[in-house]
């Protein structure tokens, strides 16, 4: 998710205390790297200093990112901390490619800009970007580092909170962030009676839910649990939606035709094979489960 209120930060911190205690906050030291993926062959944005530049949206919200605000201009969380699922995955990929933590630089890139055509200010980007063929015309995607269901958030005590089917959602006012698979799911699968509301950011969509401008907000499942735990005090995860067709996946976003893409895929393959990704999911995303499936 993308601005939580300052008063809510203590709650957000509580969500990641257990993960920090289990050691999930550490960013790995550099290793030898992958044969054929030497730094000089990767076409890095900052090749002169052998720095890996990683893009992310700002604010950086849990459970995807963690750590207290420390490095400017990052808000809510700090990717440099290595805490949170996506920060941890990013540093794990960097490690596989032979980069130390000191050789990683984070840069702010708005979500919608990450997959637009044009020159990218990063070597790869990581902020819950789902692969789809249309986006892949403009950018490269890595293999999946997370396979995700969409979920819907309502408010406790409201009629939508008791809905138990997709068909039951049709009469409600639904909303999502522009350009997201969440919005696509509303349009293509739920097909509500009234046109869904679209917002430039998830923050704006959350505010609309709090203000009663929409009845339900569609987001990915881990984000739904963050919304209800931190941003909307009376929020409720009404349910999650099963996969339609192939399973939705989050992938790293890279410049179209990037020399880094094949090596990023090899790194992710290694992280699945050696159990790193599943362990990071256990540490950072274990709380984001349990919502009923709406059919």
Task: List PLM regions with ranges.
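Acidic, polar ligand-binding/catalytic clefts
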Residues: 102-168
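A structural signal for short loop-to-beta-strand junctions that line the ligand-binding cleft
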Residues: 41-43, 75-76, 128, 136-148, ...
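Extracytoplasmic small-molecule ligand-binding "clamshell" domains
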Residues: 32-126
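C-terminal region of N-terminal signal peptides and the immediate post-cleavage residues
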Residues: 5, 16-34
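Bilobed "Venus flytrap"/periplasmic-binding protein-like clamshell domains
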Residues: 54, 59, 79-97, 129-133, ...
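Periplasmic-binding protein-like
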Residues: 146-154, 222, 229-269, 287-295
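A ligand-binding cleft/hinge motif common to bilobed small-molecule-binding domains
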Residues: 113, 129-138, 187-188, 210, ...
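Extended ligand-binding regions for polar small-molecule ligands
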Residues: 30-35, 89-92, 96, 158, ...
């Amino acid at each position: 998710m993308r601005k939580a209120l300052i008063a809510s930060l203590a709650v957000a911190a509580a969500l990641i205390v257990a993960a920090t205690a289990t050691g999930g906050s550490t960013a790995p030291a550099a290793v030898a790297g992958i044969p054929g993926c030497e730094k000089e062959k990767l076409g890095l944005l900052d090749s002169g200093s052998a720095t890996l530049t990683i893009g992310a949206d700002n604010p950086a919200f849990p459970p995807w990112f963690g750590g207290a605000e420390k490095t400017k201009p990052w808000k809510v969380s700090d990717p440099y901390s290595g805490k949170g699922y996506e920060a941890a995955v990013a540093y794990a990929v960097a490690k596989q490619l032979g980069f130390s933590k000191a050789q990683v630089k984070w840069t702010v890139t708005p979500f919608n800009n990450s997959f637009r055509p044009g020159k990218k200010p990063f070597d790869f980007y990581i902020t819950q970007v789902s692969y789809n063929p249309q986006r892949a015309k403009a950018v490269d995607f890595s293999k999946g580092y997370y396979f995700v269901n969409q979920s819907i958030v309502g408010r406790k005590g409201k009629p939508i909170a008791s809905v138990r089917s997709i068909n039951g959602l049709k009469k409600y006012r639904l909303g999502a962030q522009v350009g997201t698979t969440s919005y696509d799911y509303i349009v293509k699968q739920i097909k509500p009676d009234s046109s869904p509301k679209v917002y430039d950011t998830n923050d704006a969509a959350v505010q609309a839910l709090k203000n009663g401008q929409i009845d339900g907000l569609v987001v990915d499942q881990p984000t739904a649990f963050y919304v209800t735990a931190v941003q909307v005090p009376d929020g409720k995860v009404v349910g999650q939606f099963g996969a339609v067709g192939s399973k939705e996946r989050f992938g790293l976003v890279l410049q179209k035709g990037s020399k880094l893409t094949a090596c990023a895929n090899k790194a992710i393959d290694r992280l699945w094979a050696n159990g790193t990704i599943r362990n990071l999911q256990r540490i950072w995303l274990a709380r984001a489960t349990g919502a009923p499936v709406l059919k």
